Structure formats: C-alpha cells, structure tokens
C-alpha cells in the first residue's frame, strides 16, 4: 500500500490479505458522510506511519501489526465515534510492532476490543467509553514509555475476559487508568499485574467481584477508588490478594477490600493533599501488612481503618 485511500459517502474498505506499507505516511479514511466499515483481514507491516479512520463505523484488523517490519506510528480512530477491533498482536515480546500508538479518542463511544496476547508498542494511549480484553493473558509492554487507558474526559471501563490475566510493563514510565477495571462473571479467576519504576495511577478495580489477585509495583502508586478482590471460582478457591509495592499516594479516598485475602503494602502511605484523603483496608480473615510509614510526608485524612492488621 503506497497511497492514501479515501472513500465517498459511507463507503467501505475491505483489504483481504497481508498489507505492506510501501512508502510515506499512509491514511485509509472511510469517515466521509458518517463513516463506513474499514476491515483488514491479514497482517499489517512496514516502517511507515499508518492512520485509519472510519467515522461512526467499525475499524477491524484480524492479523498481526508490525511483526517483521514495525510501523513508525499507529493511529486508529483519531476522529469519530466508531469502535475498534484488533484480533491479534502488535509486535512480539522482544520487539515493538509500532512506535507511538493512539487508538480511539475522547469521542469514541464504540467498544475497543483487543484480542491479542501482546501489545508491544511505543507510548500508547487507548481511549473509549468501553474496552474489552479477550485474550487469555494480555501483555502490554513498552520500553520506558507510558501506557494509558483513557485521558481527559474519557473514563471507559476495561473489562477482562475470564482468565484474561492482565499484565502491563513499562520500564520507568507511567501506567495510567482513568476508568475502572473489572472482570467477567464466568467463574474463572482473573489477575492484574502492573509494573513500572514510574507512577501507576488507578481508579476502581474489581467492582463486580470477578478479580482475584492484584499486584502493583511502582515508584509511586496513586489510588482513587476501591480495590476489590474475591474468591472467583471453586476450581481456584484461593482468596484474592492485594500487593502494593511502592509509595502509595492517596489521590482520593481509597478502600481495599480483599474478602479474606492478604493485603501487603511495601512502602509508605501519604495523602495527596495533607489531611484530606482517607484509607480503609478490610481484609476479612486475611492478614494486613504495612511495612512503610503512614502520613510521614503528608498526613492521611481523619479516617484510617486497618481491619485485621
């Protein structure tokens, strides 16, 4: 593919087979007149910038992206409300498949469905009202570049499929969730592992009681909501644990409810604004272990509740 592709009103584009980006920046645009579907049924590769736009319609790629020859950058649905489906991987474990990656905008109301096992990119931002992660164990990876789900007004929920253990690794860069993370009510445990030496920012996790273990490592862990873990299935009857390794910064009132699982905080705990943000830890029968100082830098709010410490 060596030229831009633009359709007429509500026109569609279907590319069947592998797509190699030949030269220059490439844009495929079906957004005219509201939008038409944009479908690629093979793999996409080539050292170029790729921009895909489909307006209110769906953009879908069923093959891998950037395996062999990585894309310089990848932009999908940077205007329009339509959803995005990526059924396979971006890159491989050792090599990123794209540079800077932007999927969706604050206007995106369609679901972004990510079915690949690995999304190895440059700095990556995913924005939509809803996300569905359907692979068995999806891994999002960068080399010292940030990964963000939503930004600005977007606060879409990230839904993990049964047994879709989520792992994000960014070296020393930020990991940011501006919306909630939930599991799927299918009776199979789902774990979350977020790892960076930079800042991890989270809202609510496991509000529907379908998340088992939560393990977060960061230079700073910024919390604003409730982390809930649970026993999810009879086949894995272990209570979900919560482990936070790093300095915990209470951006908002924070609750950890582990329903019998152990809670461990390896680091200090401070309020983002001195004396205003509260912390409640309720582990049921599980142990609570806090190894750092509480309020040493900025005092926590009037409520500090540690049940079964």
Predicted regions and their residues:
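Conserved small/polar residues in nucleotide/adenosyl-binding loops
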Residues: 307-309
């Amino acid at each position: 593919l060596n030229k831009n592709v633009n359709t007429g009103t509500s026109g569609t584009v279907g590319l069947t087979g592998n797509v190699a980006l030949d030269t220059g920046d490439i844009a495929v645009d079906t957004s005219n007149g509201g939008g038409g579907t944009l479908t690629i049924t093979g793999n996409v590769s080539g050292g170029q910038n790729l921009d895909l736009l489909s307006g209110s319609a769906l953009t879908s790629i069923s093959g891998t992206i950037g395996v062999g020859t990585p894309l310089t950058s990848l932009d999908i649905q940077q205007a329009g409300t339509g959803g995005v489906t990526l059924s396979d991987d971006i890159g491989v474990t050792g090599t990123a498949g794209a540079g800077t990656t932007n999927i969706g905008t604050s206007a995106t109301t369609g679901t972004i469905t990510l079915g690949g096992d690995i999304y190895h990119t440059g700095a990556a931002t995913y924005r939509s009202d809803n996300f569905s992660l359907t692979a068995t164990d999806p891994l999002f990876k960068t080399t010292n570049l940030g990964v963000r789900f939503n930004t600005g007004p977007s606060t879409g929920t990230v839904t993990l499929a049964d047994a879709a253990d989520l792992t994000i690794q960014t070296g020393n860069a930020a990991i940011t969730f501006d919306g909630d993370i939930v599991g799927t009510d299918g009776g199979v445990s789902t774990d979350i592992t977020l790892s960076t030496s930079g800042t991890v920012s989270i809202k609510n996790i496991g509000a529907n009681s379908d998340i088992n273990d939560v393990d977060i490592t960061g230079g700073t862990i910024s919390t604003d909501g409730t982390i809930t873990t649970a026993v999810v299935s009879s086949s894995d009857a272990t209570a979900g644990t919560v482990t936070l390794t790093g300095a915990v910064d209470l951006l908002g009132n924070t609750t950890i409810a582990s329903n019998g699982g152990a809670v461990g905080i390896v680091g200090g705990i401070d309020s983002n604004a001195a004396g205003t943000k509260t912390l409640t830890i309720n582990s049921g029968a599980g142990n609570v272990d806090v190894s750092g100082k509480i309020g040493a830098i900025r005092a926590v709010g009037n409520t500090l509740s540690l049940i079964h410490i």
